A protein has these predicted regions:
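Exposed, low-structure sequence patches enriched in small/polar residues
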Residues: 1-204
Length: 204
Protein backbone atom coordinates (compact mmCIF):
# COMPACT_ATOMS: atom_id res chain seq x y z
CA UNK A 1 0.00 0.00 0.00
CA UNK A 2 0.97 3.64 -0.43
CA UNK A 3 0.64 6.62 1.89
CA UNK A 4 1.03 10.03 0.30
CA UNK A 5 1.30 13.53 1.77
CA UNK A 6 1.04 16.14 -0.98
CA UNK A 7 1.79 19.03 1.35
CA UNK A 8 5.22 17.67 2.28
CA UNK A 9 5.82 15.95 -1.10
CA UNK A 10 6.20 12.62 0.67
CA UNK A 11 5.13 9.13 -0.40
CA UNK A 12 5.71 5.84 1.42
CA UNK A 13 5.05 2.48 -0.24
CA UNK A 14 5.28 -0.81 1.65
CA UNK A 15 4.65 -4.28 0.28
CA UNK A 16 5.12 -7.98 1.00
CA UNK A 17 5.12 -10.68 -1.66
CA UNK A 18 5.00 -14.45 -1.31
CA UNK A 19 6.24 -16.18 -4.47
CA UNK A 20 5.55 -19.90 -4.83
CA UNK A 21 7.33 -22.28 -7.20
CA UNK A 22 9.66 -19.53 -8.39
CA UNK A 23 11.20 -20.32 -11.80
CA UNK A 24 14.48 -18.74 -12.86
CA UNK A 25 17.53 -19.09 -15.09
CA UNK A 26 20.77 -20.20 -13.45
CA UNK A 27 24.39 -20.35 -14.57
CA UNK A 28 26.31 -23.50 -13.68
CA UNK A 29 30.09 -23.64 -13.94
CA UNK A 30 31.45 -26.90 -15.38
CA UNK A 31 35.16 -27.46 -14.72
CA UNK A 32 37.29 -28.77 -17.57
CA UNK A 33 40.92 -29.88 -17.88
CA UNK A 34 43.57 -29.32 -20.49
CA UNK A 35 45.21 -32.07 -22.53
CA UNK A 36 47.57 -32.81 -19.67
CA UNK A 37 44.72 -33.41 -17.26
CA UNK A 38 45.26 -30.17 -15.36
CA UNK A 39 42.42 -27.87 -14.42
CA UNK A 40 42.03 -25.28 -17.19
CA UNK A 41 38.92 -23.33 -16.25
CA UNK A 42 35.14 -23.35 -16.29
CA UNK A 43 32.56 -23.49 -19.04
CA UNK A 44 29.10 -22.01 -18.57
CA UNK A 45 25.86 -23.96 -18.74
CA UNK A 46 22.53 -22.14 -18.59
CA UNK A 47 19.57 -24.04 -17.17
CA UNK A 48 16.01 -23.38 -16.05
CA UNK A 49 15.34 -24.17 -12.42
CA UNK A 50 12.33 -24.00 -10.14
CA UNK A 51 12.32 -23.54 -6.39
CA UNK A 52 9.79 -25.84 -4.79
CA UNK A 53 9.16 -23.71 -1.73
CA UNK A 54 8.13 -20.10 -1.23
CA UNK A 55 10.21 -16.93 -1.41
CA UNK A 56 9.13 -13.87 0.56
CA UNK A 57 10.11 -10.35 -0.44
CA UNK A 58 9.55 -7.33 1.78
CA UNK A 59 9.96 -3.86 0.27
CA UNK A 60 9.59 -0.31 1.51
CA UNK A 61 10.12 2.77 -0.67
CA UNK A 62 10.21 6.37 0.49
CA UNK A 63 9.92 9.28 -1.95
CA UNK A 64 10.69 12.73 -0.59
CA UNK A 65 10.89 15.81 -2.80
CA UNK A 66 11.89 19.30 -1.70
CA UNK A 67 11.47 22.67 -3.40
CA UNK A 68 13.01 25.96 -2.26
CA UNK A 69 12.45 28.64 -4.88
CA UNK A 70 14.38 27.59 -7.99
CA UNK A 71 16.07 24.71 -6.11
CA UNK A 72 14.59 21.22 -6.42
CA UNK A 73 15.75 18.06 -4.64
CA UNK A 74 14.04 14.76 -5.50
CA UNK A 75 14.90 11.64 -3.51
CA UNK A 76 13.95 7.97 -3.44
CA UNK A 77 15.20 5.37 -0.96
CA UNK A 78 14.17 1.72 -1.17
CA UNK A 79 14.72 -1.13 1.29
CA UNK A 80 14.27 -4.71 0.10
CA UNK A 81 14.69 -8.02 1.86
CA UNK A 82 14.42 -11.41 0.22
CA UNK A 83 14.18 -14.64 2.17
CA UNK A 84 16.45 -16.43 -0.31
CA UNK A 85 19.35 -14.45 -1.77
CA UNK A 86 20.62 -17.54 -3.59
CA UNK A 87 17.75 -17.66 -6.07
CA UNK A 88 16.28 -14.14 -5.88
CA UNK A 89 19.14 -11.75 -5.07
CA UNK A 90 18.26 -8.14 -4.24
CA UNK A 91 20.27 -5.25 -2.78
CA UNK A 92 19.16 -4.42 0.75
CA UNK A 93 19.24 -0.69 0.07
CA UNK A 94 19.08 1.40 -3.09
CA UNK A 95 18.83 5.16 -3.44
CA UNK A 96 18.41 7.86 -6.07
CA UNK A 97 18.89 11.60 -5.55
CA UNK A 98 18.42 14.39 -8.10
CA UNK A 99 19.44 17.96 -7.22
CA UNK A 100 18.72 20.69 -9.76
CA UNK A 101 17.69 24.29 -10.30
CA UNK A 102 15.05 25.56 -12.72
CA UNK A 103 14.96 29.16 -13.94
CA UNK A 104 14.14 31.22 -17.02
CA UNK A 105 16.27 33.43 -19.22
CA UNK A 106 14.48 36.35 -20.91
CA UNK A 107 11.20 34.79 -19.75
CA UNK A 108 11.15 32.37 -22.71
CA UNK A 109 14.09 29.98 -22.24
CA UNK A 110 13.59 27.53 -19.37
CA UNK A 111 16.82 26.12 -17.97
CA UNK A 112 17.20 22.98 -15.86
CA UNK A 113 20.69 22.45 -14.44
CA UNK A 114 21.66 19.74 -12.01
CA UNK A 115 23.10 16.38 -11.16
CA UNK A 116 21.93 13.01 -9.91
CA UNK A 117 23.39 9.97 -8.17
CA UNK A 118 22.34 6.30 -7.96
CA UNK A 119 23.55 3.86 -5.33
CA UNK A 120 22.85 0.34 -4.09
CA UNK A 121 24.47 -1.86 -1.46
CA UNK A 122 26.52 -4.92 -2.37
CA UNK A 123 24.72 -8.06 -3.52
CA UNK A 124 25.14 -10.97 -5.92
CA UNK A 125 23.70 -9.20 -8.95
CA UNK A 126 22.22 -11.40 -11.71
CA UNK A 127 24.62 -12.36 -14.48
CA UNK A 128 23.81 -11.82 -18.16
CA UNK A 129 23.74 -14.68 -20.65
CA UNK A 130 24.08 -13.31 -24.21
CA UNK A 131 23.17 -16.65 -25.78
CA UNK A 132 19.59 -16.41 -24.45
CA UNK A 133 19.56 -12.64 -23.82
CA UNK A 134 18.34 -13.17 -20.27
CA UNK A 135 19.61 -12.54 -16.76
CA UNK A 136 20.60 -15.56 -14.68
CA UNK A 137 21.49 -16.31 -11.08
CA UNK A 138 25.27 -16.42 -10.71
CA UNK A 139 27.05 -19.72 -10.21
CA UNK A 140 27.84 -20.36 -6.51
CA UNK A 141 31.41 -21.38 -7.39
CA UNK A 142 32.45 -18.10 -8.97
CA UNK A 143 29.83 -15.55 -7.94
CA UNK A 144 30.90 -12.00 -7.16
CA UNK A 145 29.28 -9.11 -5.33
CA UNK A 146 28.56 -5.79 -7.00
CA UNK A 147 27.48 -2.47 -5.56
CA UNK A 148 28.52 0.02 -2.90
CA UNK A 149 29.52 2.35 -5.73
CA UNK A 150 27.68 5.61 -6.50
CA UNK A 151 27.05 6.53 -10.14
CA UNK A 152 27.01 10.31 -10.57
CA UNK A 153 25.81 12.30 -13.57
CA UNK A 154 25.47 15.99 -14.43
CA UNK A 155 23.10 17.55 -16.95
CA UNK A 156 21.63 20.70 -18.41
CA UNK A 157 18.32 20.97 -20.28
CA UNK A 158 17.23 24.03 -22.25
CA UNK A 159 13.52 24.27 -23.15
CA UNK A 160 12.19 26.67 -25.77
CA UNK A 161 8.53 26.03 -26.59
CA UNK A 162 8.46 22.50 -28.09
CA UNK A 163 12.23 22.25 -28.48
CA UNK A 164 14.69 20.81 -25.94
CA UNK A 165 18.48 20.95 -26.13
CA UNK A 166 20.35 18.79 -23.63
CA UNK A 167 23.88 17.99 -22.49
CA UNK A 168 24.52 15.00 -20.23
CA UNK A 169 27.83 14.17 -18.58
CA UNK A 170 27.51 10.55 -17.47
CA UNK A 171 29.56 8.78 -14.80
CA UNK A 172 31.46 11.90 -13.75
CA UNK A 173 32.99 10.03 -10.78
CA UNK A 174 34.70 7.47 -13.03
CA UNK A 175 37.86 6.08 -11.42
CA UNK A 176 37.00 7.09 -7.85
CA UNK A 177 35.95 5.11 -4.78
CA UNK A 178 36.24 1.33 -4.90
CA UNK A 179 36.11 1.44 -8.73
CA UNK A 180 33.50 -1.34 -8.65
CA UNK A 181 31.66 0.28 -11.55
CA UNK A 182 29.42 -2.62 -12.55
CA UNK A 183 25.66 -3.10 -12.73
CA UNK A 184 26.04 -6.63 -14.14
CA UNK A 185 28.98 -8.99 -13.52
CA UNK A 186 31.71 -8.79 -16.19
CA UNK A 187 30.06 -5.80 -17.91
CA UNK A 188 31.62 -2.54 -16.63
CA UNK A 189 29.74 0.73 -16.82
CA UNK A 190 30.94 3.05 -19.56
CA UNK A 191 33.61 5.53 -18.40
CA UNK A 192 32.77 9.23 -18.25
CA UNK A 193 31.15 10.37 -21.48
CA UNK A 194 29.22 13.36 -22.81
CA UNK A 195 25.95 13.15 -24.70
CA UNK A 196 24.22 16.12 -26.27
CA UNK A 197 21.32 16.48 -28.61
CA UNK A 198 18.10 18.14 -29.66
CA UNK A 199 14.55 16.88 -29.32
CA UNK A 200 11.34 18.31 -30.73
CA UNK A 201 7.77 17.55 -29.74
CA UNK A 202 5.44 17.69 -32.74
CA UNK A 203 2.24 18.81 -31.08
CA UNK A 204 0.47 22.06 -30.26
Amino acid sequence: GTLSWKRTRTALTVGVENIKNYAYFATDKIAYNDEGGQFAGYSNRISVKQYGGSVQVFSARLNQNFKFGILHWDNEVAYQKTSNQDILPLPDLSAYSNLYIVFRIAKVLRVQLGGDVRYFTEYYAPDYAPIIQQFTVQSPETRMKLGNYPICNAYVNLFLKHCRFYVNVNHVNNGTGNKNAFLVPHYPINPMNIHFGLSWNFFN
